[in-house]
Swiss-Prot record:
GO cellular component, one term: chloroplast
GO molecular function: rRNA binding; structural constituent of ribosome
Keyword set includes Plastid: yes
Domain of life: Eukaryota
Self-association state and partner proteins as the record states: Part of the 30S ribosomal subunit.
Protein name, as recorded: Small ribosomal subunit protein uS14c
GO annotation terms (biological process): translation
UniProt cross-references to Pfam families, sorted A to Z: Ribosomal_S14
Disulfide bonds: none
Family, as annotated: Belongs to the universal ribosomal protein uS14 family.
Length: 99
């Protein structure tokens, strides 16, 4: 189980990313069609936004344990939790296959 502070930090990053998403997106679109001087100004504005508002700072975490590695996007679970839940028939449509 991940520490509670790490899970809360990730939630804070997600909230910041949602808050600044449209602003960052519009600035990035403007920078594609602008002159060099305008690009410098847009770059300065992007740099002045909070660091944690960038989408690259986000990590996917397991929804049950908070584990940051080996996550399946379709389920939002880490690999070992997915396996345990699939064996317990808690995930609809998932069958254990072995051959």
């Amino acid at each position: 189980m991940a520490r509670k502070s790490l899970i809360q930090r990730e939630k804070k990053r997600q909230a910041l990313e949602r808050k600044y998403h449209l602003i960052r997106q519009s600035l990035e679109e403007k920078s594609k069609v602008s002159s060099l001087d305008d690009k410098w100004e847009i770059h300065r504005k992007l740099q002045s936004s909070p660091r944690n508002s960038a989408p690259t700072r986000l990590h996917r975490r397991c929804s049950s344990t908070g584990r940051p590695r080996a996550n399946y996007r379709d389920f939002g679970l880490s690999g070992h939790i997915l396996r345990e839940m699939a064996h317990a028939c808690l995930l609809p449509g998932i069958k254990k296959s072995s051959w």
